[in-house]
């Protein structure tokens, strides 16, 4: 045994002062002196339990004593009567055996491979012992879980990572996956549970028994995140659920993890054999799978970035040439060829390395260097961790611990140890680079910019590591950003994303995060983009679009940041992402007079007889145009009046196309009404009321429509299935309503409200022009005449359009008693305010409250109805702005008042548009728009209150 170096001999004096009672410097062996000087963990343990030191002095640990662990633990648990005493005994047992392993390792009484085996067997023994005790306890409480045939069901535990490979390090957490075979219920207990409930409760108690810190410490930190769906998934899964997941959604990294998976307890019962057989095809492909190279290259890139970001030159696990790279080298061959070469299917690294050599997959010299380097690094790692039973792979900076490691590694001093370490890691790095290749695709500038965000995305940051990359954000925003990323990753775990989709997503996200997180509104913007991404993660084409076209990504971020409405539209209808490719068209809406032509050309791509595709095409065209209008609105290239103009022209184009489709379908079924045989046109018109009639549509406005025809009585259609002509027009209107409202994968086209027709909902859906005229002259209420002020034909034959315009003009130019009209309009407004008024007393409803938009509309309508009999030109336009102009031009309203009302009206409408883009309700603080409101209220009093 190597004598203690000078620094350690000096430290021994400190150890002597802490020796337990009954032990002196002279009474201890050289071996004890060496171990207690090297490991503070061992020293603290024997101070608390002097009998352990006496036991070790009398009989040194043996290489094969791991075979006795299960029996020793069974004896220790014999007197356990509850969970608390179980936890105490487990912790006591673990510490006792770990001291023995530390003793053997420090003194090199056992070779390093055996040390790894002992550490792994200890963990397995404790896991299985705790499981078995708790299983029996749970069965006593709830009965034994059985399948429908009454066969008892066990809890099977997969040990992952180094635990599964029999290569556990000294201070390690343990990665586990819990499973049970078949569904069923418990039998024989005080209360029945289904098997899922039973095993979930058992799993929770097992984790607590192992993981929960007590005054005696903990047994192992338990990590369950490798299970299907991670933390968001069930704690325990049935075999069927496991099989479905790995067949449908298993990802590359889960394949890699499953290579080392081993059932704890190593039972050879039928259930264990079934689970192993089920998992094997997922891990080892029958064909030679070279796609592994790119996947591992990506993982290697992540590690390289981690090394650079955190300066991990002293990290013997993750650093260049460290333990992880040796593991990657071995896994490459396992995953590429393991399906055809059973010798490569070992869970343990060293036997697999031997198989690689035997198959001549690597030169013998490379394999030899990797073996020596691996054992060197693993010994160094375990010695480092055994000093304080601390999970670390970073070399120490203090002289004492450096002296300890140099002595433990049989180096003369620290520089010599570092030199040997450097040589080994250089050998590993060379083989690694030759095999996996260095695929740094990004430019240095892109790499530098996206590197921290790649780490954020890969969930590789520690809790406080994110501060520098998000330092410009407030604490709450920073937390929100990290939470959004974590929640999005959990959501992804639930999605059946293929390998290509995962790869593209991993390429895209660092760049997206770099752009989003550089913004002051990063949290808000990211909250709008992640639902969109969640909607397209299973559609790789869209991910590739954003990944391969940085400009499209930048436009996406800008638009989503500006408008949650746009973000919602893109999330619902990802086909719109194509619109982001060309900024020339994105921010330049179609010319107002070109929507019909654009739509007609668009529909030419779709077979006319394919109704379903026609419906989809209509909706997709509308959504694309809506996006372009909104983008131009956000960019400031469209003022509010022009936004409404574009939205109105778009709606008219859609109405035109819908009527065309409905007409074609009806005529194919019934022929057309016979009165059209001798004339052009269709004898049909669609009248737009409200915002559509007034050229004032907003982004989410519905359409107020009525339908007119000019079909005489007793006319039949001329098809093989002839029907009454008026019945034809009724069915045509019904068909139009259906085409508007049918919900396809692209949503509905528009909400349509036809209640403004004569007699409202009680009236016929379609009315003859003559009946409409008669109703307006003899039955309509004043409010219906007000509505007529804002009505116009948006689709129809010239003859019917002219007929409607005549009716409208006649009604509006009818002389009325001014006082009666004033009272009726004012009372209608008061009824509306009482029914629809603002429910938020401390807020101003821009449309409904006093001084708002509706008041301006009522003023304009009142004045048209009041004075049009004197000034027929007042009937020319149906929109409020031009009506106000006409009122000023015809001397009804002072020009200054008309202009002021126009400014107030457009200002308030502009605010409504922007609130719609933000998906916010149409009310603001009471203090807003006080000047505009006061002006409107004064005008209201002047026209509708004054005697």
From Swiss-Prot:
EC number: 2.7.7.89, 2.7.7.42
Keywords recorded for this protein, A-Z: ATP-binding, Magnesium, Multifunctional enzyme, Nucleotide-binding, Nucleotidyltransferase, Transferase
Cofactor(s) named in the record: Mg(2+)
Listed GO biological process terms: regulation of glutamine family amino acid metabolic process
Superkingdom classification of source: Bacteria
GO CC annotations on file: cytosol
An example molecular function term from Gene Ontology annotations: magnesium ion binding
Location of the region described as Adenylyl removase in the Swiss-Prot/TrEMBL record: 1-440
InterPro entries: GlnE (IPR023057), GlnE_rpt_dom (IPR005190), NT_sf (IPR043519), PII_UdlTrfase/GS_AdlTrfase (IPR013546)
Region (Adenylyl transferase): 450-947
NCBIfam families (alphabetical): PRK11072.1
PANTHER family associated with the record: BIFUNCTIONAL GLUTAMINE SYNTHETASE ADENYLYLTRANSFERASE_ADENYLYL-REMOVING ENZYME (PTHR30621:SF0), GLUTAMINE SYNTHETASE ADENYLYLTRANSFERASE (PTHR30621)
Similarity remark: Belongs to the GlnE family.
Function summary: Involved in the regulation of glutamine synthetase GlnA, a key enzyme in the process to assimilate ammonia. When cellular nitrogen levels are high, the C-terminal adenylyl transferase (AT) inactivates GlnA by covalent transfer of an adenylyl group from ATP to specific tyrosine residue of GlnA, thus reducing its activity. Conversely, when nitrogen levels are low, the N-terminal adenylyl removase (AR) activates GlnA by removing the adenylyl group by phosphorolysis, increasing its activity.
Protein name, per record: Bifunctional glutamine synthetase adenylyltransferase/adenylyl-removing enzyme
């Amino acid at each position: 045994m190597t004598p203690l170096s000078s620094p350690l001999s000096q430290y021994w004096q400190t150890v002597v002062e802490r020796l337990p009672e009954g032990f002196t410097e002279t009474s201890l062996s050289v071996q004890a002196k060496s171990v207690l000087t090297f490991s503070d963990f061992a020293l603290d343990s024997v101070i608390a339990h002097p009998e352990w030191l006496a036991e070790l002095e009398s009989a040194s640990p043996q290489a094969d004593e791991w075979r006795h662990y299960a029996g020793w633990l069974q004896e220790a648990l014999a007197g356990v009567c509850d969970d608390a005493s179980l936890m105490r005994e487990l912790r006591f047992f673990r510490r006792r055996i770990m001291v023995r392993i530390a003793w053997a390792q420090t003194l090199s009484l056992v070779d390093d491979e055996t040390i790894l085996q002992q550490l792994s067997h200890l963990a397995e023994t404790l896991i299985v012992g705790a499981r078995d005790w708790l299983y029996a306890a749970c069965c006593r409480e709830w009965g034994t879980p059985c399948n429908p045939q009454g066969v008892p069901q066990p809890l099977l535990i997969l040990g992952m990572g180094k635990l599964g490979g029999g290569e556990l390090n000294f201070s390690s957490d343990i990665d586990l996956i819990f499973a049970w075979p078949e569904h069923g219920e418990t039998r024989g207990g005080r209360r029945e549970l289904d098997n899922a409930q039973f095993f979930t409760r058992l799993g929770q108690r097992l984790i607590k028994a192992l993981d929960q810190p007590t005054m005696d410490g903990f047994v192992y930190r338990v990590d369950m995140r490798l299970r299907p769906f991670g933390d968001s998934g069930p704690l325990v899964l049935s075999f069927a659920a496991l099989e479905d997941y790995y067949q449908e959604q298993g990802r590359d990294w889960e394949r890699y993890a499953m290579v080392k998976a081993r059932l704890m307890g190593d039972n050879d019962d039928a259930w264990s054999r079934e689970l192993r057989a089920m998992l094997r095809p997922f891990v080892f492909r029958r064909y030679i799978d070279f796609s592994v190279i790119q996947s591992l290259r990506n993982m290697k890139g992540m590690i390289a970035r981690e090394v650079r970001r955190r300066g991990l030159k002293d990290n013997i696990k993750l650093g260049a040439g460290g333990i992880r790279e040796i593991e990657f080298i071995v896994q490459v061959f396992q995953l590429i060829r393991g399906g055809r070469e059973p010798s490569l299917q070992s869970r343990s690294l060293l036997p697999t390395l031997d198989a690689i050599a035997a198959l001549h997959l690597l030169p013998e010299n490379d394999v030899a260097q990797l073996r020596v380097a691996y054992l060197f690094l693993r010994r160094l790692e375990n010695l480092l961790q055994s000093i304080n039973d601390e999970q670390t792979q970073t070399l120490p900076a203090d002289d004492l611990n450096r002296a300890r490691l140099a002595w433990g590694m049989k180096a003369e001093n620290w520089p010599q140890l570092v030199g040997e370490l450097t040589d080994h890691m250089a050998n590993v790095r060379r083989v690694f680079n030759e095999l996996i290749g260095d695929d740094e695709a990004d430019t240095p500038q892109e790499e530098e910019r996206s590197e921290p965000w790649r780490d954020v995305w890969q969930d590789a940051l520690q809790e406080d590591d994110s501060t520098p990359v998000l330092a410009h954000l407030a604490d709450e925003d920073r937390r929100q950003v990290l939470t959004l990323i974590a929640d999005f990753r959990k959501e992804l775990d639930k999605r059946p994303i293929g390998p290509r989709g995962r790869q593209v997503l991993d390429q895209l996200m660092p760049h997206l995060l770099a752009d989003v997180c550089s913004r002051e509104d990063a949290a808000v913007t990211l909250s709008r983009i992640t639902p969109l991404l969640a909607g397209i993660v299973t559609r790789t084409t869209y991910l590739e679009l954003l990944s391969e076209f940085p400009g499209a990504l930048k436009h996406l971020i800008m638009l989503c940041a500006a408008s949650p409405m746009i973000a919602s539209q893109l999330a619902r209808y990802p086909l719109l992402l194509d619109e982001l490719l060309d900024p020339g068209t994105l921010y330049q809406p179609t010319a107002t007079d070109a929507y019909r032509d654009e739509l007609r050309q668009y529909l030419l791509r779709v077979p006319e007889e394919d109704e379903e595709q026609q419906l989809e095409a209509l909706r997709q065209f509308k959504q694309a145009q809506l996006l372009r209008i909104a983008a131009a609105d956000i960019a400031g290239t469209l003022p509010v009046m022009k936004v409404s103009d574009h939205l109105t022209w778009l709606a008219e184009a859609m109405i035109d196309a819908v009527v065309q489709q409905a007409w074609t379908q009806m005529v194919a079924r019934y022929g057309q009404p016979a009165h059209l045989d001798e004339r052009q046109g269709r004898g049909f018109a669609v009248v737009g009321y409200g915002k559509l009639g007034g050229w004032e549509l907003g982004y989410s406005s519905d359409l107020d429509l009525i339908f007119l025809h000019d079909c005489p009585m007793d006319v039949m259609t001329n098809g093989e299935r002839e029907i009454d002509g008026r019945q034809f027009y009724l069915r045509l209107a019904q068909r139009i309503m259906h085409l508007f409202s049918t919900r396809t994968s692209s949503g509905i086209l528009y909400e349509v409200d036809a209640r403004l027709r004569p007699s409202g909902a009680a009236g016929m859906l379609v009315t003859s022009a003559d009946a409409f005229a008669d109703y307006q002259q003899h039955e309509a209420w004043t409010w219906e005449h007000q509505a007529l002020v804002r009505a116009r034909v948006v689709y129809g034959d010239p003859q019917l359009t002219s007929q409607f315009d005549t009716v409208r003009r006649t009604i509006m130019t009818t002389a009325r008693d001014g006082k009666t009209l004033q009272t009726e309009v004012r009372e209608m407004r008061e009824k509306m305010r009482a029914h629809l008024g603002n429910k938020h007393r401390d807020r101003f409803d821009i449309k409904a409250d006093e001084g708002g938009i509706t008041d301006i509309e009522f003023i304009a309508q009142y004045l048209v109805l009041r004075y049009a009999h004197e000034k027929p030109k007042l009937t020319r336009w149906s929109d409020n702005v031009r009506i106000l102009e006409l009122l000023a031009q015809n001397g009804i309203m002072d020009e200054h008042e008309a202009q002021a009302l126009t400014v107030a009206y457009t200002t308030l409408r502009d605010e409504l548009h922007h609130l719609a883009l933000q998906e916010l309700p149409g009310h603001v603080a009471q203090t807003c728009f006080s000047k505009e409101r006061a002006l409107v209220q004064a005008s209201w009093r002047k026209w509708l209150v004054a005697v």
